[in-house]
Curated annotation (Swiss-Prot):
Residues 88-178 form the K-box domain. This is Agamous-like MADS-box protein AGL8. The keyword tRNA-binding does not apply. Disruption phenotype: Altered cauline leaf shape, abnormal stem development and architecture, including enhanced branching, decreased inflorescence branch angles, and shorter stem and internode lengths. Reduced stems elongation after bolting. CDD domains: MADS_MEF2_like. Homodimer capable of binding to CArG-box sequences. It is found in: Nucleus. It comes from the Eukaryota. Residues 3-57 form the MADS-box domain.
Length: 242
């Protein structure tokens, strides 16, 4: 059978208690040294006997340095804990403030909408009225400004369109003027060419001969062709149109 579990309790016999303390103290100091060497850990062990006698072990015999490090660790840990507690309290307080602020804003919103007015006093109603009047004035001022800006933009657009139309009309007039000048030049050229051409007048005589009057020399010349060779309608005098 295996060994049963030993129940830990105070040893009543004084001698047995001292012997057990001596054995276990030596084992504890040995274990502390082993863990310090094997694991490269800083170990500080302090043991007081029932009579108040001190037994200790420290890595590299630097008990004070290890204890100072322990104190610094405890202080920083307490600071962190205190800071966390303080921040938690601040968050709780800030949440309460924000919640109250939201409630006030929601109440003001309902009042501006004309709701929940029964609970307001005369002074609060007058203050609400002044706030609404100021808001209406601000809205009207902004509306008038927006209308003025819109009208100004439309006027600028209208002026730009008028300038564009005037430019188009000017171009059309210039083109018409140029076209008229070209037509006038063509008419003058036509008139001058018709003046330079010689004018002739063909007449018929009773003898049956055709006579041509005019020409470059302004004289008359007779054609010797007999009348029988030309029809009568070809013997009509010709006229020139200027």
């Amino acid at each position: 059978m295996g060994r049963g579990r030993v129940q830990l309790k105070r040893i009543e016999n004084k001698i047995n208690r001292q012997v057990t303390f001596s054995k276990r103290r030596s084992g504890l100091l040995k274990k502390a040294h082993e863990i310090s060497v094997l694991c490269d850990a800083e170990v500080a062990l302090i043991v007081f006997s029932s009579k108040g006698k001190l037994f200790e072990y420290s890595t590299d015999s630097c008990m004070e340095r290890i204890l100072e490090r322990y104190d610094r660790y405890l202080y920083s840990d307490k600071q962190l804990v205190g800071r966390d507690v303080s921040q938690s309290e601040n968050w709780v307080l800030e949440h309460a403030k924000l919640k109250a602020r939201v409630e006030v804003l929601e109440k003001n919103k309902r009042n501006f909408m004309g709701e929940d007015l029964d609970s307001l006093s005369l002074k609060e109603l007058q203050s609400l009225e002044h706030q609404l009047d100021a808001a209406i004035k601000s809205i009207r001022s902004r509306k008038n400004q927006a209308m003025f800006e819109s009208i100004s933009a439309l006027q600028k657009k209208d002026k730009a369109l008028q300038d564009h139309n005037n430019s188009l009309l000017k171009k059309i007039k210039e083109r018409e003027k140029k076209t008229g000048q070209q037509e006038g030049q063509l008419v003058q050229c036509s008139n001058s060419s018709s003046v330079l051409l010689p004018q002739y007048c063909v007449t018929s005589s009773r003898d049956g001969f055709v006579e041509r009057v005019g020409g470059e020399n302004g004289g008359a010349s007779s054609l010797t062709e007999p009348n029988s060779l030309l029809p009568a309608w070809m013997l009509r005098p010709t006229t020139t149109n200027e």
